[in-house]
Amino acid sequence: MAEYVLTATKTEARAGSFYDRIARLYDFTFKINGYGRSLDQYFDEHPLPVFPGARVLDAGCGTGTLTLAMLRNLQVPVKLTALDLSASSMATAKKYVSKQKHSEQKVEFMQGNILSLPFADESFDLIVTSGVLEYVPLDEGFGELARLITPGGYFLNLPMRPTIATRFLELLFRFKAHPPAELSETTNRHFKVVSHYHFPRFQIIGWSKTAVLGKKI
């Protein structure tokens, strides 16, 4: 059985300390690999299923790559919350968001544990996450996120897929990609899959990730 950095039996302080230590490396990696441009293209081709005033959560925002991509591409004003366990990562994300030009969107930052999120049931119309569920047991992570989504709401997950590139990233960032069959079964148990997007192989994000949009029934 995989040993995850963050589980229900490990303290937030211990897990948060790990993320704080890797924040700069994590941020540098995303700066040079073109993930932001790939996300812009994805959101241009697949607009987020939101309406004016929708409540959106970036669960595990890290240094803000996905949050910033949403700010660049959202066409309507939403209530956006960005949450992460690492204070250092969130500080970096806040800095980048503050420099975002011509954005009418407001972002609320919160520190929290993805396995025990500080929100009531059905608090969000859309939750997005990337590179987070690989740090936690799949059932626990999915269950907690599904709890927060309204019936008819959406969940956008950018999971890691098993590749040589993913294996290198596993060693670098101490996560564990979930087996595709287990990921598919767990996704279908909580959501109806609307789309499963494969990033182009010539984009670095395509070496390790896909994008799965699910709807909570």
Identify the role of each PLM range.
Residues 175-190:
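Short alpha-helix
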Residues 128:
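A conserved beta-strand element that flanks and buttresses the S-adenosyl-L-methionine
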Residues 131-132:
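Short catalytic micro-motifs in class I SAM-dependent methyltransferases
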Residues 1-50, 65, 69:
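Conserved class I S-adenosyl-L-methionine
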Residues 152-160:
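Conserved beta-strand signature within the Rossmann-like core of class I S-adenosyl-L-methionine
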Residues 116-121:
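Short conserved loop adjoining the S-adenosyl-L-methionine
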Residues 57, 63-115:
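Class I SAM-dependent methyltransferase SAM/SAH-binding core
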Residues 140-151:
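A short glycine-rich, Lys/Arg-flanked "PGG" loop and its adjoining helix->strand segment in the class I
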